[in-house]
Amino acid sequence: MTKRLSSKQKVYTQTGINIWGKGPFLWKNNTKDKWKNTPGEHKKKHKLLERYSPMIRGDSINEMNQLGYLIPKSKNEVKISYYEPRYASQLKEKQKLRKFYANVTEKQFYNYYVKAKSFKGKIGDNLIKMLERRLDIIIYRAGFVNSIYQARLLVNHKHVLVNNKIQNISSYLVQNGDMISIKPEIVNLLRNQYNWDILQKSNGSFLKYLPYLEVDYKTMSCIYLYTPEMNEIYFPFQLDMNKVIRYYV
């Protein structure tokens, strides 16, 4: 397992977004969104990388376009990166996606990108679908744990079964029809995270519905039915996959 010494707060301040949707819980007794500030001693507000501004096309615009500061949007409108060139914008978008999946290493993330190119369809869609097949992500999406890091911990400590066999590799890619379950002796520990009486009666119906997972919260198990489509995958932030792909091109 890769060492991750930096805190979760640092990931929030680096990206400037509520990346896992749990930002308010990381800063106690605080009413402000501290992740909107840059890391370091001299904190500043994260600035928007791009603004829209109507401009007339000319030689100066063509020159700015060549330098990577402009992206054509329409006949009379261009997107201007006031604060950072195009590369920095692409890098930050890639980092957002990589850090969301519990800081997947750069080498591993690039390998996913290479595999995604070999499949039919859009590279960005293939990349996300492959990441969503990871065992730790399936456990997190099913609602058995509170975070992806907790899901990864369960897998690494051999508390997760795939088709009734122990699987301790968090990056294991689940196949259609696979059954993922938690060891019975660990189920009671996970039950303490929820109001279990309500969860048993509703069988988890108050959690986010995922059509590609058949979940049984009474036994803490689920069946991976099929690879989800992009409209079935939820992110707590806006994501521009075109920038992620252009970063590697």
Curated annotation (Swiss-Prot):
GO terms for biological process: ribosomal small subunit biogenesis. PROSITE patterns: RIBOSOMAL_S4 (PS00632), S4 (PS50889). Keywords: Mitochondrion, Ribonucleoprotein, Ribosomal protein, RNA-binding, rRNA-binding. Residues 133-193 form the S4 RNA-binding domain. One of its GO terms (cellular component) is small ribosomal subunit. Its main location: mitochondrion. It is found in: Mitochondrion. Belongs to the universal ribosomal protein uS4 family. This is Small ribosomal subunit protein uS4m.
